[in-house]
Amino acid sequence: MDQEESHVISIFETLGAYFINIFYNFLYKNALYKKHSIVTEYQYQVKGYILGVKQNKKLYEKMLDSFYKYFCNITQINSKTLNFSNFITTIVDSFIPKEYSQSISLEKKESILELLLCDYISNLGTFITTEKMLPFIIKNRKENYHKVTKEMQDYSLTFLLKKRMELYNKFLRKQAYVEPETELEETYARLSSYNRSLLHQIEELTSEKKSLLADLSTLRKKYEKRQSEYRRLVQLLYQQIQRSSTSKSSYPLTKFIETLPSEHFSNEEYQKETPADQKEVVEMELLRKQELLTSQELTSKSPNNYPVPHSRTIVSKPPDNYPVPRSRTTTKLDFDNSLQNQELHTKNGFSEKDIVEFGQDKPEEENILAIDQDKPEEENILAIKQDIPEEENILAIDQDKPEFNQDTPEFKEAVLDTKENILEEENQDEPIVQNPFLENFWKPEQKTFNQSGLFEESSNFSNDWSGGDVTLNFS
C-alpha cells in the first residue's frame, strides 16, 4: 500500500469514526429519555437524523462544522493551518483524481461532499438498524462494544472505498469522451446514442415475440385437436340421426344439427360416408315430419279437435219462389237436382223413365254428386256451420246400410219415386209457379268461404240446353 492510499484510508476511517460515534452513543442516549421502548425509539432517532441531514440545511451545516472540528482534533492539525475550505478540498480530493481537483470549483466540491455524506449516512443507518446489528447495540453494550464497533467500521470503510471507485470511473469516462467540434458531429453522436438504445429495445421485443409465437403455436395445436374432435362428434351425431330418422326423438336432434355451422359437414370424409341420394332422402323425411308436427299442433289448438277447413262451398238460395233446401247433404242435393231436372224435362216433353234410361246409358254420369270433387275448394262442403250440432256428423248417417248404396240402379229408382211423392205433396199445398229462369236451365249459384270468412263467387259446373236431344255436360 503506497503513501497516497494510506492517507485516503486514514481520512475514511476518521470520517467513519465520527458518524459511528453519533449512531452508537449519541442517538442511543436520546432514545433512553423517551417513554417508548428503547428499540422502537432508537429506530425513530436514526430515521430522524438521516432525514434531518438530507432535508434541513441548517442541521447539515451544523453537522459539517462539528465534523470539521472533530477532524482537526483527531489529525492534530491546527485549525489555523487547515481552514474550512481546505477541509472540504481535502475530503473531496480523496474521492476524485488529482488532475481534476484544480479544475473543480469550491462550490462544486461542496455539492459533491454533500451528496457523499448524505448517501453515506443513509447506508450506515440502514446497516445499524438491521436485525443482525440492532440487538447488539441495545443490549449488552459493554460486552459487545468492540465487536459491534469493529463491524460498523469495516462496513463504513468498505462503502467509502466503493464510492471512491465509482467517482473515479465517472471522471475517467468523462476524460475519454471527446466533445464534438461542430454541430453536425454533435447531432451524429446524439443520434448514434439514440440508435443504440433503439437496437437494445428491438432485441428485447424480438425475444418477446419469439416467446409469444411459441405460445401461439402451442395454442393453435390444441385448437386444431379440439376442432377435429368436435367435428368427429358432430358427424357421429348426424349419422345417429340418420339411423334413427323414423323415431320421434330424432326431431330435436335435427333442430340441433340445423343450428351447427355448415363447415362441419363440408369435409371430404363426410362426403364419402354420406352419399348425396341418402342426404336428399333424409332431408325429405325431416321436412315431412316437420309438416306433420305442424298440422298436429294446429289440430290440437282448433275447437273439438276438428280439422280446420280450407274452403267452404254452399249453394245459394235460388231466385223467385223455388223451395230452399234446409240441409246440404248428399241426399238432399241429389233430390234438389232431380226435382229441377224433372220440371225441366216435363216442360220439354220428357218423362222420368226416359231420363232414368238415359242416365243408365252413360255410366260416367251416374254419380251426380261427384262433380268437381278434385277441386280443393269443394272438398269440405259439409264443414259449414260447425257450431250447429245437428249438422256436424251428417255424412255419417246410415253409411253402413246396403240399401243406400248409390251405385245401384235400384237405389236411383227408389230415390226418384220418393222425390215424386214428396213433390206431389208439396204441389198440393202450393201450386208450382213457372219460373222464367228455368227456361235456360236452372244453374245453382255457388259461393265459397275463404279463410277470412267472406264469400267468393265461383262457377264450378255449367249445364247447357241445346234443344232437340238432351245433353247434360258436367265439367
Curated annotation (Swiss-Prot):
Compositional bias ranges of the Polar residues kind: 295-305
Keyword Coiled coil: yes
Record: glycosylation sites: N73, N83, N195, N450, N460
Entry keywords, A to Z: Coiled coil, Glycoprotein, Host membrane, Late protein, Membrane, Transmembrane, Transmembrane helix
Keyword Membrane: yes
Any single GO CC term annotated in Swiss-Prot or TrEMBL for this entry: host cell membrane
Lipid bilayer topology: Single-pass membrane protein
Localization of this protein: Host membrane
Stretches that traverse the bilayer: 7-28
Residue stretches in coiled coil: 183-233
Disordered: annotated span: 295-324
Domain of life of the native organism: Viruses
Entry's induction text: Expressed in the late phase of the viral replicative cycle.
Family: Belongs to the asfivirus B475L family.
Protein name in the entry: Uncharacterized protein B475L
Lineage, top ranks: Viruses, Varidnaviria, Bamfordvirae, Nucleocytoviricota, Pokkesviricetes
